């Protein structure tokens, strides 16, 4: 008979590997089942010549304590995101320049209604319990609205409306007409406020990792050891009874465990066959939590021509196809690049174009902001996360109206011996590496408490 593990973990991203590391440190026997041939989930680093660029998650924010502690443990070094010079704001056909954090726009440039609107959103989000956003007295009311409906009713000024719509697209990677306003508030609440999400200094985009972010998952995999993970093992069925779980994979293998952690996006968790079946609300949740849509582009140049012209390579645009971009040069400036994002419905539209059409559109964007030198890159890279079979999008799963209020409690609530994890289930920084790590700590504590208490 096969080994009876204490815990089997479905998913080999930051959440699953961090949970596995915590289990191993507690002396528990764990097995991680990873559907792909690599670790990292929604982080993926690619080596170009002698430098690692990130095609997935890449930033370590100023308040990302779990990620910072893990980087220190693994010996991963960080460096500040470059932002010296003028930034571009292109909104409603107008182009202006600003400096410093994006949140500086709240009080500057005479953007009617923006400061008041952001302050109101921060105020409403602060009222939510990040562990139970659905429990707020107005959660049902908020969950009946899309972000677009709330903006239309409550935000004055076309520029302010456009910037909040833009913020929804670049942070949630979905249209404001698709996203529940309750989810939007919850997303902001878990980060702290709008400024922490939008900003570089002190915010989510403060630092980058030398060597790329995927090395965090690879470092965790080394910590748990190769006997405790299996690659290319997509899970297709989970059967549980009063005593144990049986897990079957596409490659024909069978695993047994006392508990299971499903550490993949909810929409992917819904593709697994469960026996007994999931409770109706849990099943409904996985059907109503689609992934965001993002194409991430990296454009490598021979020199940082934008810096010589006094620009930072940071740009905000509601025109697109690039909605936000940053200087993506190496820490030693030996590789100079710009990272840009096509997000929300634009990502789905541009995914249907040819690679050459996408490249030309991105370069045209940069030329519009920084001149004709932008048209001549040395290397152009892109990653459409909707095409990833075992991610189905990025940065995170979001809920449509009417979902979080009715089904939100089932994001984390265990079903028998099955526990749920992943950045979508976090109490802090959902959609970010920090949230992924936090949920790994949370779910490992849940199961360790049960296992260790059962041995007393």
From Swiss-Prot:
Catalytic function, reaction form: a secondary aliphatic amine + O2 + H2O = a primary amine + an aldehyde + H2O2
The keyword Cytoplasm belongs to this UniProt entry's keyword annotation: no
Keywords: FAD, Flavoprotein, Oxidoreductase
Cofactor: FAD
Short name of any one Pfam family annotated for the protein: Amino_oxidase
Modified residues (S-8alpha-FAD cysteine): 394
EC number annotated for this UniProt entry: 1.4.3.4
EC top class named in words: oxidoreductase
Example of a GO MF term: monoamine oxidase activity
PANTHER family: AMINE OXIDASE, FLAVIN-CONTAINING MONOAMINE OXIDASE A-RELATED
Family: Belongs to the flavin monoamine oxidase family.
Record's protein name: Probable flavin-containing monoamine oxidase A
Species of the source: Dictyostelium discoideum (Social amoeba)
